[in-house]
UniProtKB/Swiss-Prot annotation:
Residues 7-146 form the N-acetyltransferase domain. Its EC number is 2.3.1.-. InterPro entries: Acyl_CoA_acyltransferase, GNAT_dom, YlbP. Keywords: Acyltransferase, Transferase. HAMAP family: Acetyltransf_YlbP (MF_00824). This is Uncharacterized N-acetyltransferase SE_0851. It comes from the Bacteria. One of its GO terms (molecular function) is acyltransferase activity, transferring groups other than amino-acyl groups.
Length: 146
């Protein structure tokens, strides 16, 4: 299995994301997120991925939230927003999503995730808790505490 790599913010990353736009789910494209990060060149990239050879096959964004999320994490000063975890169709069910998720958990911070595209059961199997509420787009919100 590939190693989780920190993706740089540049036009090469935009090219790597092309397969996800072609084959992935429209809700997970990350076009605006990447463009916004490229404009602010001083920011650290929130993007991580797994390669098979030279091909990016799985990706996610981890956004470090430096404010208290009192609704879900009343005892924490910081948490991570796991944003748009996605694996290309032909590479699914090979453990890449779990590998990315375990990488996020290594930060030892609470994680808030939005379950898109029938991913709720996956998150529950990985130890996330359903807070039984939805985000403004109607997707389930799940949390994980270290």
């Amino acid at each position: 299995m590939g190693e989780v790599k920190h993706l740089q913010i540049n036009y090469k990353t935009d090219e790597l994301f092309a397969d996800f736009r072609e084959f992935g789910n429209k809700n997970l494209y990350m076009i605006e997120e990447l463009k916004g990060q490229m404009i602010d060149a001083s920011s650290d990239s929130p993007f991580y991925g797994i390669f098979v050879g030279n091909k990016l096959v799985a990706r996610m964004a981890l956004l470090d939230k430096g404010e208290v999320e009192e609704t879900y994490f009343p005892n924490s000063n910081d948490y991570i927003l796991l944003w748009k975890l996605e694996v290309l169709d032909t590479y699914q069910r090979r453990g890449y999503a779990k590998q990315l998720l375990n990488f996020a958990k290594e930060n030892k911070k609470p994680i808030k995730a939005i379950a898109r595209n029938n991913s709720k059961e996956f998150f529950l199997k990985q130890g996330f808790k359903d807070v039984e509420t939805k985000n403004p787009e109607g997707h389930d919100i799940l949390i994980w505490n270290p």
